[in-house]
A protein has these predicted regions:
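Non-catalytic interaction/Regulatory regions outside core domains
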Residues: 38, 132-134, 140, 212-217
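Short active-site neighborhood of thiol/selenol oxidoreductases, capturing the structured segment around
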Residues: 66-95
Length: 217
């Protein structure tokens, strides 16, 4: 069992112990509704051309997919919900764990969320990330990738009770967030690997990313 799966399993077990059952039931029901809606069917996946982007990083410098692919053989793009999401933090730390190997394979790692640059900086510092963390204002790029949905209204007060204020984090009152997704994109901007799941507790295994790149090198 990988370290990422281990971390997620441990966190979920702890959450089941401490969270009220009513809260757990509402969260599970919302995830089930999202899965039943099959919104992931509308997302870009393997074989599609990746949408270009030009987004600000945590210190305000712009990073583009085109420029990244001019300088690297592959781009690994991870869409995440925000620093407030424990599962996202587990995943980002796991990605940091393979960052050096990705560089050796000619791949550049980029993470994207709808958070403001300040929140992106918090993400970068909290998780000690050495790769780019970009701000996708109003989920403009995530929408082009077909990943965006609105957080269920019944979950909003629950999230606030956890101290999670999505509008404040995103500087946007829409409550729109992306499904977590991971893409490996080659020099031709073709998506050669993708992981997308409506269940935000399920995340891409870092080893799968490495294997996809090695297979296409």
């Amino acid at each position: 069992m990988s370290r990422l799966i281990d971390e997620i399993k441990k966190y979920k077990e702890a959450f089941k112990i401490k969270a009220p059952q009513e809260v757990q039931d509402k969260m599970l029901e919302a995830t089930k509704k999202l899965e039943d809606s099959s919104i992931s069917k509308h997302a870009l996946t393997v074989g599609f051309q990746a949408k270009d982007f030009n987004l600000s990083n945590a210190i305000g410098n712009e990073v583009s997919l085109s420029k990244t692919l001019e300088e690297n053989d592959f781009a690994v793009v991870s869409f995440y919900r925000g620093v407030w999401c424990a599962y996202c933090n587990f995943e980002l730390k796991a990605l940091q764990g393979i960052n050096e190997e990705l560089k050796q394979l000619g791949a550049k790692l980029i993470a994207i969320s709808p958070q403001s640059p300040d929140a992106s900086m918090t993400t970068k510092e909290k998780n000690e990330l050495e790769f780019e963390v970009l701000s996708d204002n109003e989920n403009k790029i995530a929408k082009e990738y077909g990943l965006v949905f609105s957080l269920a209204e019944e979950l909003r007060p629950i999230y606030l009770s956890f101290g999670i204020d999505i509008p404040a984090s995103n500087k946007d009152d829409s409550y729109e967030i992306p499904m977590p997704a991971t893409y490996v994109i080659n020099k031709n901007k073709e998506i050669i690997f993708s992981f997308i799941d409506e269940d935000y507790t399920k995340r891409c295994e870092p080893q799968d990313i490495l294997e996809a790149i090695k297979k296409n090198s």
